[in-house]
Amino acid sequence: MSGSHVPSANGPFSALTPSMWPQEILAKYAQEEATVEQPEFRYDEFGFRVDKEDADGIPYSGQLLEDPPQRLRWQAHLEFTHNHDVGDLTWDKIAVSLPRSEKLRSLVLAGVPHSMRPQLWMRLSGALQKKRNSELSYREIVKNSSNDETIAAKQIEKDLLRTMPSNACFAHVSGVGVPRLRRVLRALAWLYPEIGYCQGTGMVAACLLLFLEEDDAFWMMCAIIEDLLPASYFSTTLLGVQTDQRVLRHLIVQYLPRLDRLLQEHDIELSLITLHWFLTAFASVVHIRLLLRLWDLFFYEGSLVLFQATLGMLRLKEDELIQSENSASIFNTLSDIPSQLEDADLLLAEAMRLAGSLTAVAVETQRRKHLAYLLADQGQLLGAPATTGLSQVVRRRTQRRKSGITSLLFGEDDLEAMKAKNIKQTELVADLREAILRVARHFQCTDPKNCNVELTPDYSMESHQRDHESYVACSRGHPRRAKALLDFERHDDDELGFRKNDIITIVSQKDEHCWVGELNGLRGWFPAKFVEVLDERSKEYSIAGDDAVTEGVTDLVRGTLCPALKALLEHGLKKPSLLGGACHPWLFIEEAAGREVERDFDSVYSRLVLCKTYRLDEDGKVLTPEELLYRAVQSVNVTHDAAHAQMDVKLRSLICVGLNEQVLHLWLEVLCSSLPTVEKWYQPWSFLRSPGWVQIKCELRVLCCFAFSLSQDWELPAKREEEKKPLKEGVQDMLVKHHLFSWDIDG
């Protein structure tokens, strides 16, 4: 740079991109060196002001910003993977995106050489690809936004000098970074009208401008908004970052249980502190040297790093937090954590040790779930716009097109359906609610003990937290009971007589053929094959829900409830154009159930955890809602395929199993949490891909208050004739064994 002042090596402003060097201040430095006068302020290599008395105590003082051996390792990697021609390797020969590999990740984790950050950040984040593919150049976007006098533009002007007041580049109106920051923020507000301006974007953009040229910083911001962070992160509602705070709280329960108990005990709302960390991606929260290391990884792996780094920070200070005496001390310690961290290697090592196994899929699943809970808590389910989800940020004048293969297989989106989706969704929910109420009224009319059941759905956040607790807390203290399948006449005093459908309390099952039971104050033995053990692990048997006793419940469930639920599952189901018809929800359920249960197959640890978590079946096998769904689907397939039953029949039978197990609402949550499967089978405007599924879950939860005993095979034709045959088989051997010849077997 001819005629300009250049910072000294490792001196003030030396880490900035050359176009950001503040020439006036550098000129004063040059004059002061000649006159041996002390300057008014001292600045570090990043341009941040340092008080004179603290100049010798600056964190990281004396440390080199770039490690020469690390730079050589990066050069060797780039040479090996990109230089296929003889000659020197230059940046224009390196692809716009770097192929992902464990080697590249290890290099990123160890740190990007500072002199390479502008070029590598653009490639790691996908910003360079975005810049090359854009129909509008940054210059054109700036031109379009320069005359855009909006509320956002006025707010940007107010915040320009507030964004980074301690940095020489942004401290004054004449600062070299101020006009750049203005143009970048106005361009972003113009390009993303649904976002406009958010103070979080200003903080991130200002930090990027310290190290990248203006247009590159803009495209980096586009990559952050569109790809690295979920949508609605910087919207006026801050819905995305609020959702991530709930996800973080869930992860703390999993990874830092001691800290979780402490926060609960002192009723501390962690999001009051950490929301700002996430909103600015740690910009202005941690020291700039530490920020650079975090951003190296953030631009490579995305928002997953925000969770890992936060968990790592909390873990490093966990012992100190546990020893805190009161809530105020805990809150202050939490607030001070970022400013007290200096060692990037220590933080990243702890973050990877603690949460290195955390995956983007797991985070996205939790995001979808907690977003739905958040919207349900705010009462924004019905009629919510399609953009409520966190799937995509919409640019001005741009629309993402489908690939040719996707369009050919599943057709184009039905625009009319998207326009009318709110009306359709309301009708579907109303039909389901009416079907549920009809079933509930049947129980209350048939069995008076159900009259006090609350039929109004609970939409609160706490209700979702209680779902799994209720599922786990099965009642085991009461005696087992059985339902009589046939009349059994009492001949001797030690026999227990009963009529068909009587409910018998089982006293002893020591003998496999003869059990001892009680009925109406009498105790005696009876043939075990003449009764059916009731599943009352989490419910008390009711004749109103037994289709063998009360046939009316079959019509209500299979004839009214199942069609209403099927209509919801069919809403937005993609229609394959090549096959000429809609896919059936049963196919989606099969795939989703298989995908969800596969996650446990390869993990011994997960099965050990499950043993402490969920209820057991009769054999002591652990059954999570996912495993229960998978088993039910397989069971229905085995029995129904043999009878050549249609998928409609299978779906109705599966719903009956879910009602029996009181998990129909949890199964819906399992299905909707299988993001890849849902996105494959359903349109973006469908119920299952919108937060509206949480309302359906709340409606279905009402049904778990009632005890169903529905036959899975009720619609199978051969079942009716076979039911009576096996009941008396083996009874004669049992009577011989117990010398009870007085009973007429053939009677």
From Swiss-Prot:
One of its GO terms (cellular component) is cytosol. The modification Phosphoserine is found at residue 403. Keywords: Cell cycle, Coiled coil, Cytoplasm, Growth arrest, Phosphoprotein, SH3 domain. It is found in: Cytoplasm. GO terms for molecular function: GTPase activator activity; small GTPase binding. Residues 111-302 form the Rab-GAP TBC domain. Residues 477-536 form the SH3 domain. Interacts with GJA1. Interaction with GJA1 induces its degradation. Interacts via its RUN domain with the C-terminal region of NF2. Interacts with RAB3A, RAB4A, RAB5A, RAB8A, RAB11A, RAP1A, RAP1B, RAP2A, RAP2B and PDCD6I. No interaction with RAB27A. PANTHER family: RAB GTPASE-ACTIVATING PROTEIN 1-LIKE (PTHR47219), RUN AND TBC1 DOMAIN-CONTAINING PROTEIN 3 (PTHR47219:SF13). May play a cooperative role in NF2-mediated growth suppression of cells. This is Small G protein signaling modulator 3. It comes from Bos taurus (Bovine). The gene is SGSM3.
